[in-house]
Amino acid sequence: MTHVRPVEIFHLGPIPIYSTVVNTWIIMILLLAGIFLATRKLSFIPRGAQHVLEMFLEFFYGLLEEIIGKEGRRYLPLVATLFIFILSLNLSWFIPGMKPPTMDLSTTAAFAVTTIILVQIFGIRKLGLRGYIRHFFQPAPFLFPLNVIEELVKPVSLSLRLFGNLFGEEMVVTILFLMIPFLLPTPIMLLGVLMGTIQAFVFTLLTITYIANFVHGH
């Protein structure tokens, strides 16, 4: 079983750089290269990777429109990037010797904190500063402390959910291999892909609902 604690690789001055960070950099480079190759020859009639990419974007555009409304399209870059990046990190165990960075709590916490900060910025831009503050007094003024606490707890909930589910998945897979050593690896790999996809989608869907909460002003 993989250790939860990341391995220290090197230092940038006094700052230690851990395996989680290096693995994340590798995935980012691979993603950028893949997107460049998929979009370098765009055509009016999409084919191959371009077709898959457009179908993916259309799916999330439809989801945003369904939950937020017509103005949901402006949040498509954030939502699509979140899903692709988290999914790629979740499935990075396909690369020999690489541990998924999302199995490190610091990675999931960084995703969660960044996402919630962006949601607050979207809320202020949509409602204005007064409307943003007033939002915390809804539906009744005495709920202000609870609404503030709820907002502060969101990054904790997001980060622990993603980390815990992925760590639990690894535990289940390890136990299955120990109990049934002759089990074919293909079903286990498919289970890992399914779980990684579900967790990336859940994180993205929660982000959309948080944005919708501010956009709709309730």
Curated annotation (Swiss-Prot):
- Give the top-rank taxon of the lineage listed in the UniProt record for this protein: Bacteria
Query: What residue ranges are annotated as transmembrane?
Result: 17-37, 75-95, 104-124, 162-184, 196-216
UniProt membrane topology term: Multi-pass membrane protein
Q: What one GO molecular function would you report for this record?
A: proton-transporting ATP synthase activity, rotational mechanism
The family database entries (SUPFAM superfamilies) matched by this protein are listed as: F1F0 ATP synthase subunit A (SSF81336)
> A GO biological process this protein is involved in?
proton motive force-driven plasma membrane ATP synthesis
* Keyword terms, alphabetized: ATP synthesis, Cell membrane, CF(0), Hydrogen ion transport, Ion transport, Membrane, Transmembrane, Transmembrane helix, Transport
- Return the GO cellular component terms, semicolon-separated: plasma membrane; proton-transporting ATP synthase complex
Compartments reported by the entry: Cell membrane
Q: Belongs to which family?
A: Belongs to the ATPase A chain family.
What is the annotated quaternary arrangement, including any partners? F-type ATPases have 2 components, CF(1) - the catalytic core - and CF(0) - the membrane proton channel. CF(1) has five subunits: alpha(3), beta(3), gamma(1), delta(1), epsilon(1). CF(0) has three main subunits: a(1), b(2) and c(9-12). The alpha and beta chains form an alternating ring which encloses part of the gamma chain. CF(1) is attached to CF(0) by a central stalk formed by the gamma and epsilon chains, while a peripheral stalk is formed by the delta and b chains.
What is the stated purpose of this protein? Key component of the proton channel; it plays a direct role in the translocation of protons across the membrane.
Q: Could you identify this protein by its name? A: ATP synthase subunit a
Source organism per UniProt: Moorella thermoacetica (strain ATCC 39073 / JCM 9320)
> Source taxonomy lineage?
Bacteria, Bacillati, Bacillota, Clostridia, Moorellales
